Amino acid sequence: QELNTGGVKVSTETILDQHADLVIGYDTGVDRDALRKSGVKMYSTDAMCTDKKPPAPATFSQVKDEVTKVGQIFNVPDKANQVNKDLDAKISGIQKQATSGAKANAVALYITPGSTEFYTYGSSSMIEPMFATNGLQNMYHSNTTRVFDASMEDLLHKNPEWIVLLAGDGEMSKVEPTFLSFKGAKQLKAVKKGHVVTMSFALTDPPTPLTITGTEKLHDLIKDKK
């Protein structure tokens, strides 16, 4: 069944009714034991497995590891190798275009329109290599937690040169106005310089080829603001 959405939560019963042979995704709403007993295999990326501590700092090798694993699952290792070579070429291309010298300080924030709360990302998030490749330094690098609560007080203290706002695809146009409505936001250096960009969270975590697409997207967004 095709659904006009980027993602949806499904139940164990729905999966079994579809007679699936393999489930690729996360455990939310799914009983792994029930799937196993019914002969349905499930694969989740390492980054979303709660029993595995993500590496910090995160690196693009995690993206290539996932591509390799999926290639093994579908018995197309040669195709996976080619995909990884193409990803390496894209990463190298961005790195060559990045500004040399000292890295500009930056933070990534997940914003939900209508909410006064927001989150930021530490060194185990794919934001880490995405920033580094684009000549940016994650100001929350010292925190190895992937995502955690942020505050305007701390943000004002750090006063980043660049701010990357992340959101769901359907909320992109509302994200920056929501952020700018927060008390103190307009005092930030990044806001005053016009160094605030918005992009889809789907282009960051978990580590997949979309992460590389997001890295290219971030490069273009930064370039347009300079």
Locate predicted features.
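Structural recognition of the beta-strand scaffold that forms the well-ordered cores
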Residues: L22-G25, M42-T45, N105-Y110, N138-Y140, ...
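Basic- and aromatic-lined ligand-binding clefts that recognize polyanionic substrates
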Residues: I73-N134
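Structured C-terminal subdomain patch of bacterial secreted/periplasmic proteins
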Residues: A58-F74, K79-N81, K158, W162-K226
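Alpha-helical, coiled-coil/dimerization segments enriched in small aliphatic residues
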Residues: E2-T5, Y119-F148
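Solvent-exposed loop/turn segments at secondary-structure junctions
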Residues: L22, G29-R32, M48-D51, I111-E117, ...
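Flexible loop/hinge segments that line or gate small-molecule binding clefts
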Residues: R32, R36-K69
